[in-house]
Amino acid sequence: MTDKPQPGGLGSIGTAAVARVGYGAMQLFETSPDDAAAVLRRAVELGVNHIDTASFYGPGEVNRRIRAALAPYPDDLVIVSKVGARYTGEQPIPLAAAQRPAELRAAVEDDLSQLGLDCVPVVNLRRMDLGPAVGADGDQIVELDDQLAEMIALRDEGKIGAIGISSVPLDVLRRALPAGIVCVQNAYSLLDRSQEDMIDVCTAEGIAWVPYFPLGSAFPGFPKVSDNPVVLDIAGEIGATPSQVGLGWLLAHAPTTLLIPGTRSITHLEENIGAGDVALDAEAIAALDAITTPGTDPWAHGVEPFSEATQR
């Protein structure tokens, strides 16, 4: 037994037990190395043992900052990366597809080198079936089976511990299940519930459901959970912040949910981790469940919604 805090309670990703509130490191490229280290160390102090990253964050700089701040790593720390894109630095979208099997392998090798690991515990295959931000064309349109064969080979070689998948519709997840998928990362929040069937499958299969954009999109022109009047009312009633209500609803909504909210601020980090202590009663959950959502996936057409939003 341990008295170490477990924000949000205990969940799992593959065979690893993790706190249900983790940390998404993407924004650490946008701050100084010292500030990045402070955020990472504070996260671990508060019980975070699931950190999400990618070699295309930076490029590679976020991985290097994680290593500088936390290595030698705590025994219980699960670092999750993703492959399938590469950093370009171009605006408004600094990423391009890198979907070919050789590119997936190269990205894993980058993770190993940048993070100083012999094996990345979990690596997500970031497909281009759903958005946002990055699409695939030409030789970047790659068969799922070819990609999974490379991921399985990497797992068999001990370079990765387990395989996840990201930005995919339900039919692609079903096709991928025989590969031993341990987590799914798709866009999902209180205001975008187009993935309910996906959540049902994850729950039935014991797969970690790890939503990105858990508080609504950070892109211009898209709704944010913290602006919703129902969320604001409940936050005021229970003495929580709107963000904590939105994250707390996600934890209550599905038992295999793991959260990886990102921030470069220690204040916001502590707020996000505090969502694990938010208690929503049945009345509050019913009110949040009743919030009207579009009912369709806003990212179903890949890059277009992002491009339109950036022009508003």
Where are these regions (language model features)?
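N-terminal binding-site loop/beta-alpha segment at the start of enzyme catalytic domains
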Residues: 1-82, 150, 216, 311-312
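Beta/alpha (TIM)-barrel catalytic core signal, keyed to glycine-rich beta->alpha loops juxtaposed to Asp/Glu
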Residues: 5, 128-295, 300-301, 305-312
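Active-site mouth loops of central-metabolism enzymes
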Residues: 24-34, 90-102, 134-140
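Feature marks short, surface-exposed loop/turn motifs that line or immediately flank catalytic pockets
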Residues: 27-29, 57, 85-87, 126-132, ...
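Short, acidic/polar
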Residues: 31-43, 99-115, 169-174
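A structural motif
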Residues: 48, 117-120, 160, 181
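Structural motif corresponding to the early beta-alpha repeats
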Residues: 72-99, 126
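Active-site groove signature of glycoside hydrolases
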Residues: 112-136
